[in-house]
């Protein structure tokens, strides 16, 4: 199951994207309308986060930096602001990809899968508690390694 956190304040885009992703096999989508809503889901495990840059209560780039303390999964920014400076800033501040609005859902799906594939090719799966690979868990925050939960 691919878990997606969708952070989007525009109800039409949020509902359309959510419906499209849920129609795909093995997708579970959690929707958040604001940065505060997204933070309430911060400790849950997600495979990818889709986030608008312009949110009513915060800037998506700032939210990205806060979510990075819990998540190492790919963060894909979406925005109608598609100038070079905005895109570069979003990527430099922790985003993994950027998709300008309006976007085609098939392109969004391809970007999601490409970003997930990139993480899987690293041989480790990101999670809320760190990286898991075989019997090992690496927690970058505490600089510790566990084998079989010990």
Where are these regions (language model features)?
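N-terminal/domain-start alpha-helical segments
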Residues: 1-122
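Short, Lys/Arg-enriched segments at the junction into DNA-binding effector domains
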Residues: 3, 114-150
């Amino acid at each position: 199951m691919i878990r997606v956190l969708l952070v989007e304040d525009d109800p039409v885009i949020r509902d359309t994207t959510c419906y499209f992703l849920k129609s795909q096999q093995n997708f579970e989508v959690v929707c958040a309308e604001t940065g505060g809503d997204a933070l309430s889901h911060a400790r849950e495990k997600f495979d990818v986060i889709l986030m608008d840059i312009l949110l009513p209560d915060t800037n998506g780039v700032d939210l990205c930096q806060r979510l990075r303390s819990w998540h190492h999964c790919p963060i894909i920014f979406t925005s109608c602001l598609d100038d070079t400076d905005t895109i570069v800033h979003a990527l430099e501040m922790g985003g993994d990809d950027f998709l300008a609005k309006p976007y085609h859902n098939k392109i969004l799906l391809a970007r999601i899968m490409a970003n997930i594939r990139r993480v899987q090719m690293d041989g480790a799966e990101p999670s809320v508690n760190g990286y898991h690979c075989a019997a090992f868990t690496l927690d970058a925050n505490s600089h510790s390694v566990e084998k079989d939960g010990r």
